[in-house]
């Protein structure tokens, strides 16, 4: 069995229990059990996250270290400070290296496991076809009247992309969601997926078909990329958009506008509207 000393050592190495040092006021330390007062019950509950308190930025800092090869860095909000009139950089901020906490080989194993969570497990609602995403869902009872609520939850998902060489990490937490099944994979993972879709364009992340293939169920709705048909004649556009529901209007034979635009994602067999001119 994992002993409390080793568990708490790794928890603290990951940055929990102390402020991250982010350039943001009001940061908290979080709450951990005192090692001297930690019994078998506290050891067990700490292992799955009950009885302790951590901040969202601590979560991001820790997971970033786990997936970047094992190095813990101080997070920051502002990369460069600019002179407003000339846009000259007057101060730059670089992440402080706090040390290596795990081996690269361990980091690679965890990344693969977390990619599997999205492709085959509880994080499947964050999956994007032809892109590699790793992540972990969370479903935590909220504290109420000195104990844990049986009906109120914090639903979360923390994920990263690409799973094999991360460029972005996303943490989503939703407290006391209404009218939905109370699971992080149901509520938070789809929100993270939408953020990843935007990040693909912003960061110019290329498709990668070498990842773990998704296990689809009848509940899944597959998303596909809309081809860019602007400038094509209508007959050619129809061939390219085969499999989509096409609606078009206007006078002429050439596509002058397309919605959704080429490169966007829609549900399989979704509708594409064309304007002709």
Which sequence ranges carry the predicted segments?
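Ligand-recognition elements built from short beta-strands and adjacent flexible loops
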Residues: 130, 172-277
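Beta-lactam-recognizing serine transpeptidase/beta-lactamase-like catalytic domain environment
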Residues: 1-171
């Amino acid at each position: 069995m994992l002993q409390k000393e080793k568990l708490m050592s790794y928890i603290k190495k990951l940055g929990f229990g102390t402020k991250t040092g982010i350039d943001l006021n009001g940061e908290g330390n979080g709450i951990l059990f005192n090692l001297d007062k930690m019994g078998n019950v506290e050891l067990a509950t700490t292992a799955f996250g009950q009885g302790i308190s951590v901040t969202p930025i601590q979560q991001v800092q820790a997971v970033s270290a786990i997936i970047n090869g094992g190095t813990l860095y101080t997070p920051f909000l502002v990369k460069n400070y600019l002179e407003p009139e000339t846009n000259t950089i007057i101060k730059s901020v670089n992440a402080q290296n706090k040390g290596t906490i795990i081996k690269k080989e361990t980091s690679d194993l965890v990344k693969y496991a977390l990619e599997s969570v999205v492709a085959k497990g509880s994080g499947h609602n964050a999956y994007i076809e032809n892109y590699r995403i790793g992540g972990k869902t969370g479903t935590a009872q909220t504290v109420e009247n000195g104990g844990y609520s049986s009906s109120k939850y914090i639903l979360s998902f923390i994920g990263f992309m690409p799973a094999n060489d991360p460029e972005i990490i996303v943490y989503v937490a939703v407290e006391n969601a209404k009218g939905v099944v109370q699971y992080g994979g149901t509520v938070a993972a789809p929100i993270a997926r939408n953020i990843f879709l935007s990040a693909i364009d912003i960061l110019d992340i290329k498709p990668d078909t070498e990842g773990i293939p998704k296990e689809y169920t009848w509940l899944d709705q597959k998303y596909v990329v809309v081809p860019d048909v602007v400038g094509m004649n209508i007959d050619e556009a129809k061939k390219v958009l085969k499999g989509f529901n096409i609606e078009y209007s206007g006078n002429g034979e050439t596509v002058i506008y397309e919605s959704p635009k080429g490169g966007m994602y829609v549900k399989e067999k979704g509708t594409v509207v064309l304007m002709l001119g």
